[in-house]
Amino acid sequence: MKLHKTPFFPIITEQTFKYSKKYVLSMGSSSSVCVGIDDVAIHFPRLYMDMKDFADLRGEDYGKLNKGLGLKAMSIPDVHEDTATMGANAVMKLIDRNGLNPRNIGRMYLGTESALDGAKPTATYIVDMLTQRYSERYGLDCFRNCDVVDMTFACIGAVDAMHNTLDWAARSTDDDERIGIVIFSDNAKYALESAGEYTQGAGGGAILIRRNPRLLEIPDIIGVSTTPVHDFFKPRREVSVKSIISNVMTLAQEAGQSIKKGIVERMIRHLPASTVRKLGIFAHGEEKVSVHRDEPVFDGQFSNRCYQQAVRQAFHNFRQKAERSGRYNHADDERFTEQWSRIIMHLPYAYQAKRMFPDVFRHDREDTDMWAEVAENLGPAPEPHNSEDPVIIEIWEKAMDGYRRAISKTPQYIDFHASRIEKGQRASSLIGNQYTGSIFLALMSTFESDLEENVNLDNMLFGLCGYGSGAKAKVFEGKVSPRWREVVSRWHLFERLAGRVAIDHITYENLHKGLQSGSVVEPEGEFALIEITESGVQEGARRYKWIDA
C-alpha cells in the first residue's frame, strides 16, 4: 500500500463550516458547557519483545505477523509493574504536566479488565500511590474527596468511564469547575503458545476531562450496540481438590515415585484432620477451589465477527441519533465517514481497523455513486439469510468475510484507510494490545503523527469507535480544538517508545510464568509494587512505593 509522501492538509470549506455549526447545535443550547479531552498521558512498560524474536521462538512466519497484522513489538510488564502502577504512573504524568492540584480533581474513574481484586477497586491502589507522592505538598487528605471506582466491560470499560465523566463534567459552572481523570490500565496477557499470544501488550493511561478542552470536544451523541455473547471472557474456573491431588500424584509417578493404589481417596478422607487443612488451597474446607486466570477464553474468528457487527450497528444507531438531533441530514450531507478527517478505533492488533471497517465503509455509502462503482466491480454482497441452521450461517459468514476482504483491496478503500485510519495503528504496532487503552493509544498515535507531518487539524471532526467483548460497541465523534498542538507537542510518544529495553525469549517466558525473581530493569522515577502480604487478615494486600530516579 502506498502512503502519502507529502503532508495531507484538510481543506476547510463552506461545507466543513456547515458541519461545525451542526456540531455545536448537537451539543444543546447556547448555555450548554462544551466538554471533552483536555490532555492524555500514557505509561507503558520499559520492556518489550521484538516480534522477530517472538516469531523465532514460536516458529511463526514473521512476515505474516508484521505485514499481515502490523505487529513489530509487544510491551511486557516487569516484576514490579501491574495494573495499579501503570495507571498511577500515567496519572502522575498528567497531574505534573498540567500543574493540577489534587484537591481540585473531583473523580478518577478507572476502566480495566485486569483488576487486582474482586472487591477492592484497583483505583484505590492508584489513589494510595498518588497520596504518597503528593501528600507532602498538598496534605495527607489531598484525594479524600475524590470519587473513584473501577468500570469493567472488557476493552470498552475506559470509554464507558469517559462518557460517564463527560456527563458529570458537563454540569460544571463558573463557580464549580468539575475536573475529572479517566484512567485506563491493562495487561493483555494470553496463554503461552495460544492463538492470541502474539497480540499481547500492556500499558496505562490517564485522560483529563474538563470543559473547554484544548484537545478534543465530545458532543452528547453516542451510538450504542449491545449483544450478550461469549466471544472473549475470563470466567471463574472451579477445580476439585480431588483432581488437584490426583494430578500431583500422577506427576510424582511420572517423576519416578512409587504411588500406592487408592492413595488419593485416603488423602481426601484424611484431609479434615490433616496438619495442612488450614493451609493454601485447603484452608477453606471446600470441595472445589475457585481459580482466576488473567488469560481469557476466546474465539478469535467469532470475536472478529462480533466486533464487525457491533460497530456497524452502533454506527447505524449513532447516525439515527444524529439525524434526530439535527446534526445530520442523510439526504443533503456528505456521508459521516467522509466528514470525519480521522477515524479512531479499538485496535487489539494494529491492522484490526483496516480489516474490520469495510462493513461501515459500505453501510455509509450504499446509496452513493462511489459505492455503485465499487459494487459494479465486486458484485453484490452475499444475500442475507433467515436460517437458524448453523451450517448455512457459517457459509454466509465466510462469504461475508470474503466480501469484506474484497472491499479492503479496492482503490477507494485503500485511499480511505491511508488518509483516515493508518496513523492510529503506528503506536499499536510497537506496543500491542492495551485492552481498554487501545482506542486512546490510537488517538495519541494519530495526533502525534499529524503533528510531526505538520498537518492542520484545527476544527476537524474525528470519528471514534470503541468495542468491548461480551459484547458492546460505541460510536461517537469529536471536534479538534485549535489548541491541540500545544497539548500534543508535550507527549513525545514515539520518542519514548524508541527508548525501551528489549528482552530475550527466556526472560519473556520467566516473566509470563512468574518465575522472574527480581525486576529485569530496576524501577526508578516510578511507582513500584514492593510486597504482597501472604497470610493473616491482610493476605493478598498489595503494597506500593515511589522509587526516586
Give the predicted meaning of each segment.
Residues 11, 18-23:
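Short, positively charged and aromatic/hydrophobic N-terminal segments
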Residues 23-80, 197-316, 322-325, 372-373, ...:
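Condensing-enzyme catalytic core mediating Claisen C-C bond formation in acyl metabolism
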Residues 37, 83-159, 328-359, 393:
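Conserved beta-ketoacyl condensing-enzyme motif
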Residues 43, 111-117, 152-158, 183-189, ...:
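Acidic, glycine-rich active-site loops and adjacent beta-strand->loop/helix elements
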Residues 61, 84-98, 307-329, 442-446, ...:
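Short, well-ordered amphipathic alpha-helical segments that serve as non-catalytic structural scaffolds
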Residues 62-85, 115-181, 364-438:
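Conserved catalytic cysteine-centered active-site region
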Residues 175-207, 212-213:
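Flexible, glycine-rich active-site loops centered on histidine and acidic residues
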Residues 392-403, 418-490, 494:
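C-terminal catalytic subdomain
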